UniProtKB/Swiss-Prot annotation:
It comes from the Eukaryota. Pfam families: Pyrophosphatase. Belongs to the PPase family. This is Probable inorganic pyrophosphatase. It is an enzyme of class 3 (hydrolase). Gene3D superfamilies: Inorganic pyrophosphatase (3.90.80.10). Coiled coil: none annotated. Its EC number is 3.6.1.1. It comes from Plasmodium falciparum (isolate 3D7).
Length: 380
């Protein structure tokens, strides 16, 4: 299928390096070339040159939901705006964020500047991928202002091979810092296998019924979490429900999910166990130790402290004028990804990957004092 652009009601999407720190958008000057269109369907352009034609129907079904959602929103008494730039499904598409200062909107980072928690006890979820979508969008840690862009792998835009059935995103001001090492001890493996986090903000899923908007900041209630080992890295997933869902008041735990959205949890776990099979030919591993609400909130706060520690480590390293670059993981300590995966699956009776949940007990091991933070990650 050839490339075709659809522009719903126009909108100014020229690539003017819109997340340059000098770029401010006036909310009073209506003739400014950066004048912002409030409704998403007047801003979004779509390139229909998809790898999978099923994506097209999903995109259009989502557009119908977007049209009445304002791109200007208030969170914790602060006014924010998100803006779509260029054409979705192209390399130069990105979502940028702004905060209102006096009469202007100034660029901000969704990772650094959006609050993690709200006054009512909810947490803020930054939506990267909407329900039923294939396009793998992600906060870009190494780009200025950490804009959201489509992820790339081997130089090509990345897509899920199967659409995701939940709204997926990240928690601001959290970080799975590879400086911290975790271990798995079991009867099967007498020696401890060591793992580190995946060097990204903490992932979160909304199990609510609605398709949220790409880039939207949504208050959610935490329900639980699970530990995923994805190609040898720890990758925790927080499970939540958005505040506007019709069952928000009814669902307060993982067990409540089954009452109102039957089979959601088992489908969710199976999806994350198998979604990389088309690429890696291997199943991910999920620990049978599911987190309850309190344990999940403790995990969120731990990764928030990791985020603060990372910011402090970056500051110290810059002050020392060091030019050292990141050690992706200290594999002298953390061993080897392939080795860890093979060891976890070394069972004479039955391969671990035949089970939905595995007997993997992940506990904290230690902090690597020699670890250097990645100075390529953008910080204010």
């Amino acid at each position: 299928m050839g490339s075709k652009l659809i522009n719903v009601e126009g909108g100014n999407n020229q690539d003017d390096n819109k997340y340059n720190s000098n770029n401010v958008i006036s909310i009073n000057n209506k003739v400014n070339k950066n004048d912002y269109f409030i409704e998403t369907n007047k801003e979004l352009k779509i390139n229909l040159n998809f790898q999978n034609n099923n994506i097209i129907s999903n995109i259009f079904s989502n557009i119908n939901i977007y049209d009445k959602i304002s791109n200007i929103f208030i969170n914790n008494k602060k006014t924010y705006m998100l803006k779509y730039n260029n054409n979705i499904n192209e390399e130069n598409f990105f979502i940028s964020y702004f905060e209102k200062k006096d009469d202007n909107f100034v660029p901000i980072s969704p990772w650094h500047h959006i609050d993690l928690k709200n006054d009512d006890g909810t947490y803020n979820m930054i939506v990267e991928i909407t329900k039923y979508n294939y396009i793998k969008l992600e906060i870009q840690l190494r780009e200025k202002f950490n804009v959201i862009k489509q992820d790339k792998k081997k130089g090509k835009l990345r897509y899920y091979h199967n659409s995701i059935y939940w709204n997926y995103g990240a928690l601001p001001q959290t970080y799975e810092y590879p400086k911290h090492i975790y271990q798995n001890k079991s009867k099967k493996n007498k020696e401890a296998l060591l793992f580190t986090g995946d060097n990204d903000p903490l992932d979160i899923l909304d199990i609510g019924s609605a398709c949220l908007k790409i880039g939207q900041v949504v208050p959610v209630k935490i329900l639980g979490a699970f530990t995923l080992i994805d190609e040898g890295e720890l990758d925790w997933k927080i499970i939540a429900i958005n505040k506007e869902d019709k069952h928000y008041e009814d669902i307060n735990s993982l067990s409540d999910i089954e009452k109102y959205y039957p089979h959601t949890l088992s489908l969710l776990l199976e999806w994350f166990r198998s979604y990389k099979m088309a690429d890696t030919k291997k199943l991910n591993l999920i620990s049978k130790q599911l987190y309850d609400k309190k344990e999940s909130e403790d995990l969120i706060m731990k990764t928030h402290h990791y985020y603060l520690e990372f910011r402090e480590d970056v500051k110290k390293l810059k002050e020392e004028h060091s030019k050292e670059t990141i050690k992706e993981h200290d594999y002298v300590n953390a061993q080897n990804i392939q080795f860890n995966y093979d060891k976890l699956n070394n069972n004479d009776d039955e391969p671990m990957e035949n089970n939905l949940l595995e007997d993997i007990n992940i506990t904290y091991y230690k902090s690597d004092s020699a670890y250097k933070p990645d100075l390529n990650i953008w910080t204010p």
